[in-house]
Amino acid sequence: MTKYTFKPKDFKAFNVEGLDARMEALNEYIRPQLHELGEYFSDFFTSQTGETFYPHVAKHARRSVNAPKDTWVAFATSKRGYKMLPHFQIGMFEDQLFVMFGIMHEAKDKATRAKVFERKFKAIQQLPDDYRVCLDHMKPDKPFIKDLTDDDLKEAIQRAINVKKGEFFIARAITPQDKRLKSDKAFIAFLEETFDQFLPFYSA
């Protein structure tokens, strides 16, 4: 019995039609692991940074018609919420599990906070080849950093700094069939390795 990881069939929760039915599927197949990951990694971030982190599992409470296309657990230093702060995420769409760190368009002092990515531009470019960026957390698209030109990357960061709706995340994503989802041990190792790469951007 696994505690943290997801099986390919768990991702099929996103194929269930209708808001109530899909929420039921998420509650059965995905949210239990998100809560466990929330406990594990809030402790992980607290020990790594010396700041107290809190987990926030997506509730999708505002939805009244459209079923969610993704779900997640986010980690931030506020008990009340994460959207206003730089935060870490573990989440899923039907075809990917993603891990991210960055700043949403709702972030407080977004222009100032996003400048960390400007300052650490070289460090972004030096991330391993399978690392990506996400410029809109609502969409599954996450281009590989290695496929972006310097100008593409600079423009994306500037958009997060200067445009109200702009946001910027560094990310990693794997498919539902990925071998790193086959066991809790492999999955946690993958997540810790990813967050170890993200943490210098948080503490900068």
From Swiss-Prot:
Name by which UniProt lists this protein: UPF0637 protein SA0957
Span of the signal peptide: none
Organism of derivation: Staphylococcus aureus (strain N315)
Family listed: Belongs to the UPF0637 family.
Top-level taxon: Bacteria
Lineage: Bacteria, Bacillati, Bacillota, Bacilli, Bacillales
InterPro entries: UPF0637 (IPR009403), UPF0637_domain_sf (IPR053707)
